[in-house]
Amino acid sequence: MASRRDVLIMLGVGLAAATAGVVLAPRLGHPPAGSEIAALRGARLTGLDGQPARLDALNQHILVCNFWATWCPPCVEEIPALMRVRESYKARNVEFVGIAIDQAAKVREFATKLAISYPVFLADESGIELVRTLGNPSGGLPFTLVFDRSRQVAARKLGALSEQEMARMLDQALAS
């Protein structure tokens, strides 16, 4: 039978562990503020033409960065919605980019077939590690980040987005 002292010690340890979990949980999986855009700018990306590509040219825009693959059904399903939202926010300095973690030939064929209206880049084999660095520890797809004008992550979502969710995320980024 445990003594009163042992019970109090166990309660104290449990309380300390719970407190640590509450304090640390929001930080796990999310990189320090500002490091996301640096990781994205430093990523080895190529355009659909096979040439190296960089995201530096999009500095004045709210940036929506969507990681996807042709073999990912939720990714494929959300692309038409992303194109529609992009069209409705284009005049408000919002730019979309897609980063495919896939084989170049499949992405080129798919992007042509769907007539994807925003820039599409290819990540090399380090693409999954890049999404982990950007706050997606599971490496799952689709994964979307919204960067505000100050280049901070305004929103992130693992999983497919609806048009309404994307509009809410963009409205919040535009308001900040």
Name each model-derived stretch.
Residues 76-115, 125-131:
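Structural microenvironment flanking redox-active thiols in thiol-disulfide oxidoreductases
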Residues 55-72:
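Short active-site neighborhood of thiol/selenol oxidoreductases, capturing the structured segment around
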Residues 1-42:
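N-terminal targeting signals for export/organelle localization
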Residues 112-116, 125-171:
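Thiol/disulfide oxidoreductase modules built on the thioredoxin-like
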Residues 40-41, 63, 141-142:
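Short loop/turn microsegments at loop-to-beta-strand junctions
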